[in-house]
Amino acid sequence: MAVPKRKTSPSKRGMRRSADALKAPTYIEDKNSGELRRPHHIDLKTGMYRGRQVLTPKENA
C-alpha cells in the first residue's frame, strides 16, 4: 500500500486546493444587441457568432 514519505504541509495542501474554488461565469456585452452573453459562445437571441449568422433564431409564439 502506498504511504506518503513526508507529511503534507498546510502550504502545499492549500496550493493544491486553490484550484478547487468555484468561479463565477464571465459575461460580456454583445456589440450588436447589448445583451449579456458568454465569451466564445453563440448569442442565442440573434444567432450571431463573431459577426456571422450561425443559427436562425427561434421566434417566440
UniProtKB/Swiss-Prot annotation:
Please name the GO terms of the biological process aspect recorded for this protein, alphabetically: translation
Q: Name one GO molecular function term.
A: structural constituent of ribosome
Basic and acidic residues: compositionally biased ranges? 28-39
Q: Is the keyword Glycosyltransferase assigned to this protein?
A: no
Example GO CC term: the record gives: large ribosomal subunit
List, as start-end ranges, the regions of compositional bias called Basic residues: 1-16
UniProt entry tagged with the keyword Ribonucleoprotein: yes
Gene3D superfamilies, per the entry = Single helix bin
Q: Which UniProt keywords apply?
A: Ribonucleoprotein, Ribosomal protein
List the InterPro entries: Ribosomal_bL32 (IPR002677), Ribosomal_bL32_bact (IPR044957), Ribosomal_zn-bd (IPR011332)
Q: Which Pfam families match?
A: Ribosomal_L32p
Q: Where is this region: Disordered?
A: 1-39
Similarity comment: family membership: Belongs to the bacterial ribosomal protein bL32 family.
Q: Which NCBIfam families does this chain map to?
A: rpmF_bact
In Swiss-Prot or TrEMBL terms, this protein is called Large ribosomal subunit protein bL32
**Organism whose genome encodes this protein:** Rhizobium meliloti (strain 1021) (Ensifer meliloti)
